[in-house]
Amino acid sequence: AAQMQLEVLKSQIDPHFMFNNFSILSELIVEDTALAEKFLDNLSKVYRYVIQNLKRDTVSIEEEIAFLHSYIYLIKMRYEDAVCINIDETLKQIDGQIPPVCLQLLVENAIKHNRASARHPLSIRVFREENDIVVENDLRPIASDFESTGIGNKNIVGRYLLLCKKKPFIEQRENTYIVKLPIINNT
């Protein structure tokens, strides 16, 4: 039963990721076809990673960071200087695991739910703190009529509880949103 729950939680990522990126691609096709072609090439690389890892419960932190860099390329193509993402490169040296696509989902949610402009860029930081990988972003919520369903965070928490019985730490401060993902030790 736990394996079935894990598969359902992992499958929630696929449509969420796909439709958000196709929406970006659609806008780029109208704006600049050469840029759209380059974006599509990188989207293919990113999507290949997602497909290749759907059946895996965890990936190395090094693999996940490499994937996140590819994803950030797509983000920079779309948002340019409106989003500033800083990844501590020493994360690649950690001998541990993480559920696939968790970091990307947190970065995507930060961008989706916060105001960002070239004048006031949204800052997102990814770094290590003790036995956690931390994704921290400025908190500047977009004023809108829609209420977040929290599916992304619920998905991540659910995956962690099923995999290692550890729960990610999620905190909203006055100006900062923080998620701490436990590093899963290699066994």
What is each stretch, according to the model?
Residues 1-182:
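Two-component histidine phosphotransfer core
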Residues 186-187:
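C-terminal end segment of the histidine kinase catalytic
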